[in-house]
Amino acid sequence: MKKTACLALLMAAALALGGCAVSAELAPAPAPEGATARAQVDWPKERLETDENGVPVLDVYVVADEQVERVDVETYVEGVLAGEMKNDWPLEALKAQAILARTFVLKFLADKQSKYEGADISTDIEEAQAYDASAVNDRIRQAVSETEGLVLSAGGELPYAWFHAHSGGLTALAREGLGWDKDEPPYTQIVPGNEPESATGEKDAQMLREAQHWQAAFPYEEVEAACETLGVDVTLEDGAKLTIEERGDSGRAVRLGLNGQTVDASDLRIALGSTKMRSTLITSLRAQEGKLVMAGTGYGHGVGMSQWGAYGMAQAGSTAEEIVTYYFKDVSIEKLW
């Protein structure tokens, strides 16, 4: 799935793991205001067994171990949270990510089947979400415990819980950020990303700088091969005409003109590598010295929650509920177990 590969790969690379453990006695917190004890949300409970506490159990193919492991959803979400976001980030940002991670896996189970035999889902970033059980600490456990069973609901349905590292200023609709060719989901919207200008600590500060602005150079043959996988025959040379044929409402490139041929920008990003071509918010594009050189802002497809935006909002005092409902419109947070 295009959006899954893009989303998980860029997060795993953009947000290196680290941080300090936080000792805490963990207990599930009350559901947010508006969340019911057992909400009427359509989710694939018939596919899953539950443990003695009523928490669904997953068969997860762990790529690193090359085997299927049985874990409950909450334990799985801990590993995802540690893989998708730094484990020393503000607690409310981690809680927001946990709600999205839980929603993501249930939406995956509702719509898809893992390519790994005997598994419900995997830790393969091309299939689902990043996962790093070794980076789980007390802060991660607290974020998951305090959001236990909570998911996003869009009119009683599980939404696509999209997220990205940095919006570059504005979030995107799915049709421009992901090349979404279906009806635009009613819960996506373009809003200011709310990312901070600076971050505390040298590691976070460096990560933020890399997410704010990027530049990449691709040899012509690499670009031509990538375009070929997309069914577009492109030949590049120094001085070739390169244009942004169409931009979406958030300013992202939707279609690129490469020496007379048109290619979908989000597709090209995946084909070239989403950790190199970090976004489609392209600010410059040129062909010189045997390479396609481009620069841009932001990191990721731009749809849904900005992780750096969640960081900034949490630092400013926003709750997890306020964060996720800022990025997704007309949604509620509901408790499934």
Feature locations, PLM:
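Conserved, single-site charged/polar hotspot
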Residues: 1-337
